Amino acid sequence: MTSPTRRRTAKRRRRKLNKRGKLLFGLLAVMVCITIWNALHRNSEENEPSQETAAVSNTDQKKEVKKKTAKKSEEQIKTVDRNQKISNYLKEIGFSGTAMIVRNGEIVTNKGFGYADRKHYIQNNPLTSFYVGSSQKALIATAILQLEEKGKLQTSDPVSTYLPHFPNGQTITLKNLLTHTSGINGHIEGNGAITPDDLIKDIELQGIKRQPGVWDYKDSNYSVLAYIIAEVSGEPYEQYIKNHIFKPAGMTHAGFYKTYEKEPYPAVGYKMEGSKTVTPYIPDLSQLYGAGDIYMSAIDMYKFDQALIDGKLYSQKSYEKMFTPGSSSTYGMGFYVAPGSYSNHGVMPGFNILNSFSKSGQTIVILFSNIQNNAKLGQVNNKIYQLLNQE
């Protein structure tokens, strides 16, 4: 028989063991909870949009992967901000986009402002891609002048040389198309996809408004030129632009609309409606064949301008031809000609582009905005020139 003393000792031992067991179980439970919380917190952090990574489409979840796999050289691109007055001015007016400013061969500003993607809080950066709208007409004009130098065509040729059924085609010249003095009615842009052949047929069907010689800006003038580039060069116009403009100019982030979402940093376009910012609908850009189907970064536009200035893309004779006004509008071939500078402008749903450089080639101002209508970029451009001249 067990003594009372032994029984009490055994009970105390069991109570201690029970307490230790409960304590151990509690510690294990706490450790499991901490492990689960850490895992969930880490996942939530990975899913939060970074403000310094690539812009993502509202509907394309694959962009999250693209942000993490972008090339190191792109991730590490440095912002240049050597003129605080210009930066402060752009911030004050609410500029959203990328500004690239070069003075006497030195980069003064190469900086993103505002958000490339407002939904995901992703900021614009120097490599953000934008649709450039009508600013691409300068590239089409360059291609035509290149083909003229190669003896493939003449800007004085009548359009009927290449399009026999074109209305008034024996009178309208390629130069009339280049300078927007053709007199055509042009294609009425729709929303759906259209082939280049069907686009040209519709332009022909629309007929003419007047005889050539009077300024009348039409995207269709440059759609016809893009079609002729393909006919004369023997390769799709997109491929010609890639091989003979993008490549020699070093425009590594320029491309055509079908690959826009594959770029590391594609901007989402916006428009102001009262105090609200909305994302406007962009029609199928086959409707803007040769006249608004290209995208690029501000750096790419700078490289294009510099290639023109340096004579990398054509001769001095072609340069002078491009920058000679074709009418009282002061529009040459892809650029407007002002007393001290050359410029072009592109506006699309959600995008606003201004590209300008001085006649000396010493000053280049490029403003790519992903808000269509919150700033008059012509006035902004003039203000930047003033601030540069104060230095």
Curated annotation (Swiss-Prot):
This is Putative penicillin-binding protein PbpX. The chain crosses the membrane at residues 21-40. Induction: Up-regulated by sigma-X and sigma-W factors. Coiled coil: none annotated. Residues 50-59 have a biased composition (Polar residues). GO terms for cellular component: plasma membrane. Residues 44-76 are annotated as: Disordered. Its main location: membrane. It is a single-pass membrane protein. It comes from the Bacteria. It is found in: Cell membrane. Pfam families: Beta-lactamase. PANTHER family: D-ALANYL-D-ALANINE-CARBOXYPEPTIDASE/ENDOPEPTIDASE AMPH (PTHR46825), PENICILLIN-BINDING PROTEIN 4 (PTHR46825:SF11). Belongs to the beta-lactamase family. The keyword Membrane applies. The keyword Protease does not apply. It comes from Bacillus subtilis (strain 168). Disruption phenotype: Cells lacking this gene display no visible phenotype during vegetative growth or sporulation. Keywords: Cell membrane, Membrane, Sporulation, Transmembrane, Transmembrane helix. One of its GO terms (biological process) is sporulation resulting in formation of a cellular spore.
